[in-house]
Every structure is written in structure tokens, then in C-alpha cells.
């Protein structure tokens, strides 16, 4: 049987099509929404899903799978759940939550998923990093030995912080916790502009959790005016954002900071504040029907903060010698540091800066309680000159606070007690500092040296700030620069400094 030419042509065409036929299917695992409400969706059918995997709803809203149960999956929704209905399709993305990281992020304000919210357009060249990763192991770490200066006399002298340390800032609302954090960012400006290599530069990441949008906008303005935004990243999960984003923001910020840590650079991350993250996590856990524990927090709320703060570390020389320093902030209620979340974070961190309302209202700002504040590892990183100068400072201040409480009751005090009260009042006056005016470490050394060695003892309290300005404006720059060196305060420098301070004190008096 012979085919006509037309039929033969068709046969050839069909044969060629069949031999070149291939399937290019993309198979997505999908599920259906069983119930939705309060930002939680229960989904049936996602049998292969991973814990912490991102999913996408039919409306375009994303979510994260947190509860993997026999019958369904509990998904927390990133955004409004009003567009999600029962029976809607839910698609797996196959990826665990990740965020952009890299130097392209500097100077930008992003949300908890790394999406820019500052109106400056899309992010340029960047890599993506998972928000949840394991902290560096013991072998990969090195003990803290480099200083991380805050620019605050009270902190750098009494509770010094090193690169790679975790130092908690704890206090009631409106006691100046955020002010300490912002001053620390501003203080890096001088170091970063002077630093010729990456080993000196300190990049900053500020994570705002549950704050007002107006507060975040004000912070952006302060950093912009001080030219500090160029080395900073702001991650904002504001009060109007859903609880899952407030829970996720610290991990996202940490992933951005880890980019610098893992590439031999140095970064500082501020979590402001972790109390609000714990509240957001409690909300999610209760809605997911996880059993509540103390103060209705879930049983793993300690792990929530420990796995985050353990990622701040000083890396060993073999792994690049980078570092990530963390300053978590915790808000207390009526000064109660023995509540659940404060005790958890105190036990995780390497020390704490305790702020008190009473000191704040007495005009002692920063309102640091010297007795309760401690730095467990920072003294190893402190400059030698600062260590020499402030050796007796903490003891004298603690004794002063103790004696001052009893001095209110008795009028006839012996000469030694009066001298202690006199010196203590002047040391307290010297530790005061205006907001947004961080001091370089060498200038701090001069001021504290003058106070500890009695150059202010006969001076009226209201003249001390004037004396401080006078010595800082007229001191020999070469002498000032020498305090930054590793040698510390030599006898020749002490003699020169003593003569200068005595002369300036005479002029003020």
C-alpha cells in the first residue's frame, strides 16, 4: 500500500515531532486551607513540607510552616489573613526563609524579609542567607580581646565591651536604653572614617522590633544627619506589622550581620527590644495551640533567645578573625530584673548594663546602676591606659552610693566619709554625658584620670562640665594620641598630664 505524497509528508512530520517530544512539567505540591483566623492557617495536604519552609497562598500572601502535625500543618501568615478563605490552594516554595545580605544593604531600611521600605529602589548586588543557621562551634571561636567603644564614659570605663561580646542593656521604659545603642552607632563614625582597612571598620545593624513607625523614622533622620547611615543597616518590624514578622526580624538582622562576621569584617547588632519579640512569639505559640508555661510563654522561649545570641561571636584567626557583637535590649516592669525573660537573657549574655528610673530622673544620664552592671569578658579587651585609670573608679562609686544612703540620716560625719562623699559626687558628675555626643576613648581617659586623681575635688559641682570642656579643648593632641597606644600611661606622660590638669584647674577656679 502506497501513501500519497501529502500523507507521506504528514507521517514524516509526525515521526519527527514524536522523536523530539519531551515533557517539561513543573510539579508543585499543594494543599488546601482547612481553617484560618488570627493570623494562623491550618492546611491539609502538604505532606512533604519542611519545618520553617515558606509557603504561598492563592492571594499572594506568604507564610511560614511552624507546626507539622499528623492531619494538618499550622502556618503563620506574613500579613493580613482577610484575603485567605477556607478551601484556598496553598503552594510550597521549597525554600527556608532567607534574606539579602552584603554591603549593598548599608544605608538601607528593610523589613523583616529584607524588602526595602525606604523608597530608594531595589537592592543592588547582594547574596541571600538563611535567617536560621547554627552558631559557630567552639573551635571556630576565639576569646574576646579587641575593644568595641561606645563613646560613653560610664560604659567604656566601668562595663567595657569587646568585639564578639553579648552585652545586655536592661531597664524600665524611658530610661535611655535606645540612647546608649544609638550613641554606640554614632561613635563608630570617627573610627570608620579613620580606618584604612576592614579590620578597624565596624558595621552596624539596628533591629527595631515592635516600635512606632515615627520612632524608626526619627532614628533614620538622626543617623542620616550624623552621616552614620552609610555604615548601618536598619531592619524594622514595627508595631503595626504582624507578630510573625516581629518574631523573625532579629534573625533576619543577625543573618545580615553574619555576612560581615564570616568575611573577616566586624559588625555590631542591636536588638531593640527582645521583650517585644518574646511577646510576639508567645502570641504565635498560643494561637498554634502549643502548651503555655511560666507567664504563658511557651517552653522553648529560652531557646528562642539563646540560638539568636549565640550567633554573636569572635571568630578565630583560621576562620577569618571577623566578629559580631550583640547589644540586646530588654524592657523591665518596675525595675524587676528577676522576671522570666530578663533572667533568661541575663543568663545568656556576657554581662549587662542596668539602667534605673530613679537615677534617670535625678539627672544622672546615662542612668547606669554601677553595682548591678557588669561585663564578664570585656576587661580583656579594654585599652591598657583606660584600665590603669579606672581601676579604683567602680569601687569608689559603689562605696559612695552605699555611704550616701546613710549620710542622709547623720549630720556629724568624719573627715574620711566626707572626703568619700565629696569624691563620689564628682565622679558621678563626670560620668554624666549629653545624648548624641559620644567621646573618643582617649578623651574619656583624660577626663576620668582628672576625676579619679582628685583634680576636681575642690571644684564646685556646677563647674565640672566647664573644666571637662576646657581640658579637652586645650590638651596637647600628641599627648592625647599617645593614650591610644598599647604602652598605656607611662610615668613621663603622667607627669605631663598632671601638670596640665593642675594648671587648667587653677584657671577654672
Swiss-Prot record:
<dbReference type="InterPro" id="IPR020003">
    <property type="entry name" value="ATPase_a/bsu_AS"/>
</dbReference>
<comment type="subunit">
    <text>F-type ATPases have 2 components, CF(1) - the catalytic core - and CF(0) - the membrane proton channel. CF(1) has five subunits: alpha(3), beta(3), gamma(1), delta(1), epsilon(1). CF(0) has three main subunits: a, b and c.</text>
</comment>
<keyword id="KW-0472">Membrane</keyword>
<keyword id="KW-0139">CF(1)</keyword>
<dbReference type="GO" id="GO:0043531">
    <property type="term" value="F:ADP binding"/>
</dbReference>
<dbReference type="InterPro" id="IPR036121">
    <property type="entry name" value="ATPase_F1/V1/A1_a/bsu_N_sf"/>
</dbReference>
<dbReference type="GO" id="GO:0045259">
    <property type="term" value="C:proton-transporting ATP synthase complex"/>
</dbReference>
<dbReference type="InterPro" id="IPR000793">
    <property type="entry name" value="ATP_synth_asu_C"/>
</dbReference>
<dbReference type="InterPro" id="IPR038376">
    <property type="entry name" value="ATP_synth_asu_C_sf"/>
</dbReference>
<dbReference type="InterPro" id="IPR023366">
    <property type="entry name" value="ATP_synth_asu-like_sf"/>
</dbReference>
<dbReference type="Pfam" id="PF02874">
    <property type="entry name" value="ATP-synt_ab_N"/>
</dbReference>
<feature type="binding site">
    <location>
        <begin position="171"/>
        <end position="178"/>
    </location>
    <ligand>
        <name>ATP</name>
    </ligand>
</feature>
<dbReference type="GO" id="GO:0046933">
    <property type="term" value="F:proton-transporting ATP synthase activity, rotational mechanism"/>
</dbReference>
<dbReference type="Pfam" id="PF00006">
    <property type="entry name" value="ATP-synt_ab"/>
</dbReference>
<dbReference type="GO" id="GO:0005739">
    <property type="term" value="C:mitochondrion"/>
</dbReference>
<comment type="similarity">
    <text>Belongs to the ATPase alpha/beta chains family.</text>
</comment>
<dbReference type="Pfam" id="PF00306">
    <property type="entry name" value="ATP-synt_ab_C"/>
</dbReference>
<dbReference type="InterPro" id="IPR033732">
    <property type="entry name" value="ATP_synth_F1_a_nt-bd_dom"/>
</dbReference>
<protein>
    <recommendedName>
        <fullName>ATP synthase subunit alpha, mitochondrial</fullName>
    </recommendedName>
</protein>
<keyword id="KW-0547">Nucleotide-binding</keyword>
<keyword id="KW-0999">Mitochondrion inner membrane</keyword>
<keyword id="KW-0496">Mitochondrion</keyword>
<keyword id="KW-0375">Hydrogen ion transport</keyword>
<dbReference type="InterPro" id="IPR005294">
    <property type="entry name" value="ATP_synth_F1_asu"/>
</dbReference>
<keyword id="KW-0066">ATP synthesis</keyword>
<dbReference type="InterPro" id="IPR000194">
    <property type="entry name" value="ATPase_F1/V1/A1_a/bsu_nucl-bd"/>
</dbReference>
<comment type="function">
    <text>Mitochondrial membrane ATP synthase (F(1)F(0) ATP synthase or Complex V) produces ATP from ADP in the presence of a proton gradient across the membrane which is generated by electron transport complexes of the respiratory chain. F-type ATPases consist of two structural domains, F(1) - containing the extramembraneous catalytic core, and F(0) - containing the membrane proton channel, linked together by a central stalk and a peripheral stalk. During catalysis, ATP synthesis in the catalytic domain of F(1) is coupled via a rotary mechanism of the central stalk subunits to proton translocation.</text>
</comment>
<dbReference type="InterPro" id="IPR004100">
    <property type="entry name" value="ATPase_F1/V1/A1_a/bsu_N"/>
</dbReference>
<dbReference type="GO" id="GO:0005524">
    <property type="term" value="F:ATP binding"/>
</dbReference>
<dbReference type="GO" id="GO:0015986">
    <property type="term" value="P:proton motive force-driven ATP synthesis"/>
</dbReference>
<feature type="site" description="Required for activity">
    <location>
        <position position="373"/>
    </location>
</feature>
<keyword id="KW-0067">ATP-binding</keyword>
<dbReference type="GO" id="GO:0005743">
    <property type="term" value="C:mitochondrial inner membrane"/>
</dbReference>
<dbReference type="InterPro" id="IPR027417">
    <property type="entry name" value="P-loop_NTPase"/>
</dbReference>
<keyword id="KW-0813">Transport</keyword>
<keyword id="KW-0406">Ion transport</keyword>
